[in-house]
């Protein structure tokens, strides 16, 4: 069976309507274009994100189901509350973006490759320099042991990847993101694809249409820029 995948031109940042995304593979919408900040921002504003491996063209996705959570509804399990109460780590925002994305890009387990390619790292580094992409860092004894990064569109945070060098440190980073984003009236966190790891926090799937309705509601409501100042943050055991 031959699949038709629209190829994006270099000279404009228009995307096909997300309703045209394939059902198999689920959510594949287009290929090509580039990873310019303008195109990536336009993609996120429409519920689209890039995801591809080395050797593949740039692939753009908008899955039929989207994993999302309102940050004020994050669930902290009793086991995580015990870990948090020990308070043997520190948390920061945008102190080590490049180190976080490098750690997220490292192959895991039996994997020999990563979808966070050199070109993707360079693209998100540009977004970080423009104040669009941000990182949460978890430190223990001044060593980076966990974290995550993503893109903020209005009052929606689009999470891209997270990592742990010690048990539970990516979970700590996610809880910290939710609490901090909620403090600054962030409305929605887009986790893209649902996993058991995310489900434990209360992340749930919504249909693409519902997600895009939320996105359209919140993407033009900008939060206070102080949310993303370089700073130390604290996690509440609640």
UniProtKB/Swiss-Prot annotation:
The keyword Transferase applies. Its EC number is 2.3.2.6. InterPro entries: Acyl_CoA_acyltransferase, Leu/Phe-tRNA_Trfase, Leu/Phe-tRNA_Trfase_C, Leu/Phe-tRNA_Trfase_N. It catalyses: N-terminal L-lysyl-[protein] + L-leucyl-tRNA(Leu) = N-terminal L-leucyl-L-lysyl-[protein] + tRNA(Leu) + H(+); N-terminal L-arginyl-[protein] + L-leucyl-tRNA(Leu) = N-terminal L-leucyl-L-arginyl-[protein] + tRNA(Leu) + H(+); L-phenylalanyl-tRNA(Phe) + an N-terminal L-alpha-aminoacyl-[protein] = an N-terminal L-phenylalanyl-L-alpha-aminoacyl-[protein] + tRNA(Phe). One of its GO terms (molecular function) is leucyl-tRNA--protein transferase activity. Keywords: Acyltransferase, Cytoplasm, Transferase. This is Leucyl/phenylalanyl-tRNA--protein transferase. It comes from Psychromonas ingrahamii (strain DSM 17664 / CCUG 51855 / 37). The gene is aat.
């Amino acid at each position: 069976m031959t699949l038709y995948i629209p190829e994006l031109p270099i000279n404009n940042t228009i995307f096909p309507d997300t309703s045209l995304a394939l059902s198999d593979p689920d959510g594949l919408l287009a290929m090509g274009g580039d990873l310019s900040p303008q195109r990536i921002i336009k993609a996120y504003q429409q519920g689209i994100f890039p995801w591809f491996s080395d050797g593949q063209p740039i692939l753009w996705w908008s899955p039929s189901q989207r994993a999302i959570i309102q940050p004020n509804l994050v669930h902290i399990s009793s086991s995580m509350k015990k870990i948090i109460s020990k308070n043997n780590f520190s948390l920061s925002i945008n102190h080590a973006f490049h180190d976080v994305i490098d750690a997220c890009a490292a192959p895991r387990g039996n994997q020999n490759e990563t979808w966070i390619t050199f070109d993707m790292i360079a693209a998100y580094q540009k977004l970080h320099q423009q104040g669009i992409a941000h990182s949460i860092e978890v430190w223990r004894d001044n060593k980076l042991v966990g974290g995550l990064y993503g893109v903020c569109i209005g009052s929606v945070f689009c999470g891209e990847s997270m990592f742990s060098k010690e048990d539970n440190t990516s979970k700590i980073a996610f809880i910290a993101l939710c609490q901090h984003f909620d403090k600054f009236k962030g409305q929605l966190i887009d986790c893209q694809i649902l996993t058991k790891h995310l489900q434990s926090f209360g992340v749930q799937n919504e249909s693409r249409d519902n997600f895009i309705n939320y996105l359209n509601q919140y993407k033009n409501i900008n939060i206070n820029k102080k949310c993303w100042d370089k700073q130390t943050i604290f996690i509440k055991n609640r």
